[in-house]
Every structure is written in structure tokens, then in C-alpha cells.
């Protein structure tokens, strides 16, 4: 259910974002970002109905409590992640508007939108490839070997794609927006660095999801957004919006270290 919900949400968001970007520009991208959690929630309700209810011989519905209990950890993790992401994004947009100006907030949103656009496909690949492998009964001592195997397969492809995005950052910016947004090209190095570490972090993070490690998941999520907000507040006056994007990169480095530490602790190493 979690896997299907992620894939459906990713595909629907990508289509909606491309369409709204084409017709409405940056305003359309903002609408698409706001619609993403709504679409995710609706897809989840649909999948939950299919999983938790079964059709009887008389055409009615029979509630299956045991299957619903299995879904609750995934529902909680999805709602926590989606809720925190959008609350923090709104806060940071307001912070940039207050500390710098509205134009800078628009530039930061534009950079965020580009990142969200290509990361939609990365998330879909992870949901199809990584989550099923970790959902299998993998012994704890084989976890690191499995993670290494996944990274050896996916990371080179992701790295090449990100290098291509960086090399063509100016044409991409002009295609999606206009020459007025060309100044965001200076942010690409930090955003792509953040997303590269995010990919590695997600390999281990998806293990927490697959194994329903709720406490560890909550710890990592709260740490993630605390670092992002704290460093953004600290760096925004010195570096402007680049400081916020730098904070995002450091955030995922820290998350990677934390999640590996938690997993090694679980393995007794």
C-alpha cells in the first residue's frame, strides 16, 4: 500500500506540476506543491479502503481490523513526513520574505520546485526497488550488505543524472521559468549536494519504513527539520537564500550519519 501510494502520488504530482508550470509558471508550481499532500492523502484513503475492507458475497463490506493495524505505522509515517515538510516550507518561505525580501523567497521556491520535480521520479524508483527489498526477511547482519548493493546499483545512475542537471542548469531554469530567475543557478551546487546525500540517506531511511521502526523514524524526522530550521536561522543573514540551501545540504549529511548510527546500534556494533 505504501509503495503504491508513493508511486501514484509521484506520478500525479509530476504530471500536475509540469502542466501547471507550463500554463501558470511559478504560481502553477506553488499550486502543484500544495496539492501534493492532498493527492497523497486521497490515494492513501483509496488504498486503505481496498486493504481494510473486503467485499462479502452479498455485496457488502466487511471490516478487517488486523489488516488496518498493519497499515497504521505507514499511515503515521506518511502523515508525519508530509505534515512536517509543508509546515517547514511555509515557515522558511516566510523567514526569507521577512529577513531578505519576497523576490528571494520566490527564487528559493523556484529552486525547491526544480528539486521536487526530479526527486519525484527518484522517490518512485525507490518505492519500486528499495522498499520491496527491505520488506523481505533480511537478517540484521545482512542489512549493510544489502544497502551497499542497492547503492552500487542506483547511486551511479543518480549521480550521472545530477551532473547532467548541473551542467544544463541555465537552460533548465530558462525553460521552466524565465531569464529573471537565472540567479538561482548559483544555488544548484548546494541543492544537488543536498539531494545526493538525501539519496544515500533514503536507502537507510526506507529500511526504517519497511521494518516499521517508528521511534527511530520520528527521531530522524525531528532531527532533520530541527537542523534545517536552526542552520537556516543562523546562516540566512550571512549568506542569504544560499544559506538556507546550504542548511539543507548539511541537514542530509547529518541525517545520514544519524540513521547509520541508529542502525549500527540496532546491530550491536
Where are these regions (language model features)?
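Membrane-interface junctions at transmembrane-helix termini in multi-pass inner-membrane proteins
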Residues: 3-5, 193-220
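Interhelical loop/hinge segments that connect adjacent transmembrane helices in multipass membrane
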Residues: 4, 33, 44-89, 137-145, ...
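Hydrophobic alpha-helical transmembrane segments
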Residues: 4-52, 223-227, 241-265
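Interfacial/gating helices of multi-pass transporter permease domains
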Residues: 29, 66-78, 95-116, 182-185, ...
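Helix-loop junctions and terminal segments of transmembrane helices
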Residues: 54, 111, 115-140, 207-210
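Residue-level signature of transmembrane alpha-helical cores of multipass secondary-active transporters
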Residues: 70-82, 86, 90, 94, ...
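Interfacial transmembrane-helix starts/ends
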Residues: 72, 109, 142-156, 164-168, ...
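Interfacial segments at transmembrane-helix termini and the short loops linking adjacent helices
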Residues: 102-103, 148, 167-196, 242
